Swiss-Prot record:
One of its GO terms (molecular function) is ATP binding. ATP binds at A9, S10, M11, N12, A13, G14, K15, S16, D87, E88, A89, Q90. This is Thymidine kinase. It comes from Zymomonas mobilis subsp. mobilis (strain ATCC 31821 / ZM4 / CP4). GO terms for cellular component: cytosol. GO terms for biological process: DNA biosynthetic process; thymidine metabolic process. Keywords: ATP-binding, Cytoplasm, DNA synthesis, Kinase, Metal-binding, Nucleotide-binding, Transferase, Zinc. Belongs to the thymidine kinase family. The active site is at E88 (proton acceptor). Pfam families: TK. PANTHER family: THYMIDINE KINASE, THYMIDINE KINASE, CYTOSOLIC. It is found in: Cytoplasm. The keyword Cytoplasm applies. Coiled coil: none annotated.
Length: 193
């Protein structure tokens, strides 16, 4: 039986790089994959998964109203798929996570999801919440805090690198807006305000 995987990490841990490597491994063996990324992420061109080290691949952009089941099933009928890979999985909604589980269960296609576990306020994203709840396999991708400890938190900062405590859960950004920290330094930075 195919499995639903959730690979989670803080910012700058190499989630997209890992996804692109997994995609390459499948394709190198002549297997068909289908890649998705969040349409809300506009750091690069829409419908492109790009890693900080320069690797990239085309992907289907998903939105709040997207039916991943319909898209995957339609593609699978045309050309049998061997793996589905989802970048920015924290932006999935509950229904989409359950659609991905159905892809595993009914179509027997493994689904590999990569995303953040928590936001800048240490709150779960909707997609992450349901992936943590129903994924068959959970794996943490390690990142490093400036102190050398494991980074598990995402600190949002302003243009002067000052910590931000409040705001919308979703604000797209990279190294200019977020710093991956260990829990200790995350709390220290927030308490320094």
């Amino acid at each position: 039986m195919a499995k639903l995987y959730f690979y989670y990490a803080s910012m700058n841990a190499g989630k997209s790089t890992n996804l692109l490597q997994a995609d390459f491994n499948y394709r190198e063996r002549g297997m068909q994959t289908l890649l998705f990324t969040a349409g809300i992420d506009t750091r690069y061109k829409q419908g492109v998964i790009k890693s900080r080290i320069g690797l990239e691949a085309p992907a289907i952009a998903f939105f709040e109203e997207s039916s991943l089941w319909d898209i995957i099933q339609e593609q699978h009928v045309k050309n049998p798929l061997h793996c589905i890979l989802i970048d920015e999985a924290q932006f999935l909604n509950k229904n989409q996570v359950f659609e991905l589980a159905r892809v595993c269960d009914d179509l027997n296609i493994p689904v590999l999801c990569y995303g953040l576990r928590t936001d800048f306020q240490a709150e779960l994203f909707e997609g992450s919440k349901y992936l943590l709840a129903i994924a068959d396999k959970l794996a943490e991708i390690k990142s490093v805090c400036f102190c050398g400890a494991k980074a598990t938190m995402n600190l949002r900062v302003d243009e002067n690198k000052k910590p931000i405590r409040h705001g919308q859960q979703t604000e797209i950004g990279g190294n200019e807006r977020y710093i991956a920290l260990c829990r200790r330094h995350f709390i220290e930075k927030l308490n320094s305000l």
